[in-house]
Swiss-Prot record:
Domain of life: Eukaryota
Cellular component terms (Gene Ontology): chloroplast; mitochondrial large ribosomal subunit
Record HAMAP family: Ribosomal_uL2_B
Keywords carried by this UniProt record: Chloroplast, Plastid, Ribonucleoprotein, Ribosomal protein
Origin species: Olimarabidopsis pumila (Dwarf rocket)
Subunit structure: Part of the 50S ribosomal subunit.
Pfam families, sorted: Ribosomal_L2, Ribosomal_L2_C
Presence of the UniProt keyword Ribosomal protein in the record: yes
Protein name in the entry: Large ribosomal subunit protein uL2cz/uL2cy
Length: 274
């Protein structure tokens, strides 16, 4: 990813660093509208995810996470920006005339060919079952349920590693550091997700953050007591508690929130590192 720095003419360009190469020109048959009337709200209109709202209108790009066009070679035609994720997407023209979007693998360029199937080469961008991959392969867009499509390692720069295969399961090390078991019949894509330098971008001003649909985050200690348990006091007062809590009074910063009896508890060999 090429980071473009502007001349220092205004505060926004003085502090900003954006990607100047990838543009967006989606195909009409691969996009659809989204319903965002109350961002961060549930069906009752109550805020369930704070600091969200506003933002520019978006069109959803239909991404092929299943990669079920078996043994049909496709060619990368474009590499595009997707406002719904921090990874890039690329348009694939398949040999049978079908066109689909997939996540852009790191290092893939326009003109490269990809294919999915059971006996395909271990090449960046190809999709195949875990049972056909050698140990140590870097993968992304990993299925959890067979045929449902990739659900793991889909963010920009994400990559997992196949570290073992035994019986009907394969052992993966995920980007979070978690080590877990997945069926060997599930498929994944070889390589790493592109746009690795997404964290190097600097928005430069608060307005650019609002375009993304993100609102300001206010500390509880500067609020009033009616708004947050940390609020109140004269001047810069401490929180007045032994440990910090959430706006609803539950313990924060360290309390484990995962349910103890989840079905995947036996599949996780090592918890993710924090």
């Amino acid at each position: 990813m090429a980071i473009h720095l502007y001349k220092t003419s205004t505060p926004s360009t003085r502090n900003g660093a954006v990607d100047s190469q990838v543009k967006s020109n989606p195909r009409n048959n691969l996009i659809c509208g989204q319903h965002h009337c109350g961002k961060g709200r549930n069906a009752r209109g109550i805020i369930t995810a704070r600091h969200r709202g506003g933002g520019h209108k978006r069109l959803y790009r239909k991404i092929d996470f299943r990669r079920n066009a078996k043994d049909i070679y496709g060619r990368i035609v474009t590499i595009e920006y997707d406002p719904n994720r921090n990874a890039y997407i690329c348009l694939i023209h398949y040999g049978d005339g079908e066109k689909r979007y997939i996540l852009h693998p790191r290092g893939a360029i326009i003109g490269d060919t990809i294919v999915s199937g059971t006996e395909v080469p271990i090449k960046m961008g190809n999709a195949l079952p875990l049972t056909d991959m050698p140990l140590g392969t870097a993968i992304h867009n990993i299925e959890i349920t067979l045929g449902k499509g990739g659900q793991l390692a889909r963010a920009a720069g994400a990559v997992a590693k196949l570290i073992a295969k035994e019986g009907k399961s394969a052992t993966l090390k995920l980007p979070s550091g978690e080590v877990r078991l997945i069926s060997k019949n599930c498929s994944a894509t070889v390589g790493q997700v592109g746009n690795v330098g997404v964290n190097q971008k600097s928005l430069g001003r608060a307005g650019s953050k609002r375009w993304l649909g993100k609102r300001p985050v206010v500390r509880g200690v500067v609020m009033n007591p009616v708004d947050h348990p940390h609020g109140g006091g004269e001047g810069r007062a401490p929180i007045g508690r032994k440990k910090p809590v959430t706006p609803w009074g539950y313990p924060a910063l360290g309390r484990r929130t995962r349910k103890r009896k989840k079905y995947s508890e036996t599949l996780i060999l090592r918890r993710r590192s924090k």
